[in-house]
């Protein structure tokens, strides 16, 4: 079974650095699960990898550090291990805040028992900004569920919801005007309860399952 590990390579900022790093990882049969670059354009860039690796990481680290563009390499805990699954809450500020109360309170219960769930929020208004934000959630690392919190959402936002659901993202909507509730996985009237149920739906330490529900609107 491959081990999932995190690596931070401190490198020079230059064209072709990522190509050299990934070439070494491929030579060690590492499967790159995630990559992020911090400090690009500065003298010291930091390239973070999450890799599935069958062998010990020591040989991989040594070969990476042998590259002329690499200053040093550190093995770190993965962001999956530290922050875990992400709940993304988008919409009107008042509703987002109430959903966050429920989500954070429920996540606390599961994280105490060894789960890792984090909660991200962004208050937004307007059909186009909201639709763009919904589509972007599918590109966020470790995003497990999206909660749409507002009084009226439809049109392009509903189309965006269909797209991200087709990519496997769980979408929960408050009971609101517009077509978004009609295309979401779960509709909840109370915002605090919406946050609670979303966390329960993604937590490995919970017995709650959407597949066992006889209805999807509460």
Describe each region flagged by the PLM.
Residues 73-76, 81-209, 213-217:
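Conserved mixed alpha/beta catalytic, RNA-binding, or beta-rich assembly cores of soluble enzyme
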